[in-house]
């Protein structure tokens, strides 16, 4: 270790940029079973995220009837999740930097489990809302720390596929709430939300901490032990460990980043890419389409049940396809571009269906047009814009910025999510077809943004990505 430290000091004495190998042939590319176990444990947090978001839809009428809630009271219950998530997102970066990635996941699982138990025991709207707020806080923290943890433990050749499992398990969590909610009451459904929290809390005791975080806080021996576990006992980790240590050493003299540091010219590109992707992920209208899909089908004269079943199956299948086969073969940028173009087509199909209905034209094809538009839109979102912004967010930020910048982009995501959900009904009242033409316009802006600013990160180490963007 002393020799390695001396080497790093010699390198740092030279005023040379950090140059990393282009082909990375000497970097450990092996992944032991521990990488897969660690990822599966971590995405229990993603599944928990999905259950939180999906809980309100199948429970609305049961909760309102049993607790005698008005529509406005239930609307508060539904939306307060976002308020808790924003607070969780604001604090997530600092918490994960202070107590570690595993510590942040454990804390979030405990808070979420308490929230679910309060919902289960609720006798009125106040405890119901408080429990929902706590689950939202857990969601906000998990939405940041899970993709970051996966990115930091994964070999670069698997990082995209493993990181995309975050979105896949969010979708599975959403779908499970709809399926289980169809056969159990709302209190029992709340108890099912505790299960992933329990698995996540206890599972983190059996997996290593992020090696990069361990090195960042000066736990050098733990860093090497964790990296060796993740790469396998026979793997040669010398080069990979050296790159990580050299890169972190180059950042060691820098103070902890503040929000003002994010607008510094050497950091602004990281922030623009991260914030921009989160902005476009939401403002293409995804929450409006998902939350009100049944309303869209009914308004267009299509079967809401059939449409909901089709888009739920499609979302899981295509997210899995993107996670396992495409992201590390085709790359991030091509999938993002294809996703945005597909969503534009979906928006035009849905918008045209409402325009035809408003003018009483081609009434016999309107249901097929609306359903196909939603399916094209959801499918396109699932292969790219759903998962990849979180993957890129976890890859691009230097570790000294990751807490502050990652927290910022997660807050932007949750605030954008709330704003889209809140404004969707007002836009639909203004003009159903105009709503989707507006979202289509945002898709066009997203295509331009991706083409001009988003880097390709496939096949690069985290240190290479961050050096490339400096």
Curated annotation (Swiss-Prot):
PROSITE patterns: MFS, SUGAR_TRANSPORT_1. CDD domains: MFS_GLUT6_8_Class3_like (cd17358). Residues 1-24 are annotated as: Disordered. GO terms for molecular function: sugar transmembrane transporter activity. It is found in: Membrane. It holds the Pfam family Sugar_tr. Keywords: Membrane, Sugar transport, Transmembrane, Transmembrane helix, Transport. It is a multi-pass membrane protein. The keyword Transmembrane applies. Residues 1-16 have a biased composition (Basic and acidic residues). One of its GO terms (cellular component) is nucleus. The chain crosses the membrane at residues 33-53, 73-93, 110-130, 133-153, 164-184, 188-208, 270-290, 307-327, 335-355, 373-393, 409-429, 434-454. Its main location: membrane. Sugar transporter. Belongs to the major facilitator superfamily. Sugar transporter (TC 2.A.1.1) family. This is Sugar transporter ERD6-like 8. It comes from Arabidopsis thaliana (Mouse-ear cress).
């Amino acid at each position: 270790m002393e020799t390695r430290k001396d080497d790093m000091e010699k390198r740092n004495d030279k005023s040379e940029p950090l140059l990393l190998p282009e082909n990375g042939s000497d970097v450990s590319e092996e992944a032991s079973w521990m990488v897969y176990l660690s990822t599966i444990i971590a995405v229990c947090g993603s599944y928990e995220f999905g259950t939180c978001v999906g809980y309100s839809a199948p429970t609305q009428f049961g909760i309102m009837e049993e607790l005698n809630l008005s529509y406005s009271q239930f609307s508060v219950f539904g939306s307060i999740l976002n308020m808790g998530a924003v607070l969780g997102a604001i604090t997530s970066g600092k918490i994960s930097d202070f107590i570690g990635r595993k510590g942040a996941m454990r804390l979030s699982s405990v808070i979420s489990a308490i929230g679910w138990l309060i919902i289960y025991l609720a006798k009125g709207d106040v405890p119901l809302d408080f429990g929902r707020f706590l689950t939202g806080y857990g969601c906000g923290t998990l939405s940041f720390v899970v993709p970051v943890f996966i990115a930091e433990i994964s070999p670069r050749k698997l990082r995209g596929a493993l990181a995309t499992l975050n979105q896949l398990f969010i979708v599975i969590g959403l779908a499970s709430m709809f399926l289980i909610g169809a056969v159990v009451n709302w209190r029992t459904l709340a108890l099912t939300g505790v299960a992933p929290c329990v698995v996540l809390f206890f599972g983190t005791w059996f997996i290593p901490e992020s090696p990069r975080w361990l090195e960042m806080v000066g736990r050098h021996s733990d860093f090497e032990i964790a990296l060796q576990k993740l790469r396998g006992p026979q793997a040669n980790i010398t080069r990979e460990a050296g790159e990580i240590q050299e890169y972190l050493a180059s950042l060691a003299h820098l103070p902890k980043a503040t929000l003002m540091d994010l607008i510094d010219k050497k950091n602004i590109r990281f922030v623009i890419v991260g914030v921009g992707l989160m902005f476009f992920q939401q403002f293409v209208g995804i929450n409006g389409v998902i939350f009100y899909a049944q309303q869209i089908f009914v308004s267009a004269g299509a079967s809401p049940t059939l449409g909901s079943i089709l888009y739920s199956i499609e979302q899981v299948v295509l997210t899995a396809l993107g996670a396992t086969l495409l992201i590390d073969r085709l790359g991030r940028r091509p999938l993002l571009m294809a996703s945005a173009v597909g969503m534009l087509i979906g928006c035009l199909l849905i918008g045209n269906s409402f325009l035809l209905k408003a003018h009483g034209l081609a009434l016999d094809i309107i249901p097929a047009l609306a359903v196909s538009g939603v399916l094209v839109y959801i499918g396109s979102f699932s292969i790219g814009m759903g998962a990849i912004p979180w993957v890129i967010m976890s890859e691009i930020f230097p570790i000294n910025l990751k807490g502050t910048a990652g927290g910022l982009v997660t807050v932007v995501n949750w605030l954008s999510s709330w704003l889209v959900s809140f404004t969707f009904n007002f836009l639909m009242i203004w003009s159903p077809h105009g709503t989707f033409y507006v979202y289509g316009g945002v898709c066009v802006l997203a295509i331009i943004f991706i083409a001009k600013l988003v880097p390709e990160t496939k096949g690069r180490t985290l240190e290479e990505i961050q050096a490339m963007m400096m």
